[in-house]
Amino acid sequence: MYKIVTRRELVPHISLFEFSAADIAAKTKPGQFVILRIDEDGERIPLTIAGANVGKGTITVVCHEVGKSTKQLASLKEGDCILDLLGPLGKPAEMKNFGTVLCVGGGVMVAPLRFQAQAFHQKGNKLIGVVGARTESALIFQDEMRGICDELYVATDDGTKGYKGLEFLSELLKIKKIDRVIVMGPIVTMKTVSELTRPYGIPTIVNLIPIMVDGMGMCGACRVTVGDRTMFACVDGPDFDGHQVDFEELMARLKMFTPQEKIAFVFHEAGGRSH
């Protein structure tokens, strides 16, 4: 069992959890993820690690309520326990002094992006950060990213704060010498940024946490096409070359499960059980 030592709502429907997990904290590096299960009947939920405190023996994850299982997780309180926490999984992000790194985060994935940005900063990189969300009220970790980055830009889909959308990056890429780009967020965000950086030949790394079950590559649920190869996000990633990922295929596969997620969420809201 893994105890929740800290739980706080960052914005509506997005919550931060700090779990007591000394064994995982001791091994965690930025870019890795965990798979948690709330109880015996629970689904496996993959979440990118947003922080680790070896001294306290804790790891931090941030969860967005989008379905039955994440809604159930969000209902837990400090002091509650979950059954399983498997990790750290996946390959750590490559960390060295690249020069100038552009870190683009969207939605809930700004949280693990901050974890990576801290590590890039410690390696001596100059950081340009972009924090994005659907609307101003959904933005998270703006102040924290501002404290790490040399420059920070804010973007929202509806233009309620900062730039509207990510098209402003086209101009930024023209005037800045950027050596590496890290993108964490919705699939469409990673696809858009990868398309914008492609003409400049800037190495662009995307963090893929698609559908996962076992986290060890045996189930094949997390397969992605990268270049001409089929790879598995849980063991080969989760970081991949954004210019090689087949985003159209990935988005189509993820949409296959949308109806089931909606049905499970309705059952959960009604107090029923869906398997």
Residue ranges and their predicted role:
Residues 1-78:
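Ferredoxin-reductase
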Residues 6, 51, 154-156, 206, ...:
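Structural signal for conserved beta-strand scaffold positions within catalytic alpha/beta enzyme cores
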Residues 36, 84-85, 224:
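A generic structural signal for residues embedded in beta-strands
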Residues 39, 87-88, 227:
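Short, surface-exposed secondary-structure boundary micro-motifs
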Residues 42-51, 89-99, 234:
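Short, Lys/Arg- and Gly-enriched loop/turn segments at beta-strand edges
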Residues 68-214:
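FNR/FR-type flavoprotein reductase catalytic core
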Residues 112, 187, 209-239:
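Local cysteine-cluster metal-coordination motifs and their immediate loop/turn environment
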Residues 232-236, 240-275:
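Short Fe-S-cluster ligation motifs
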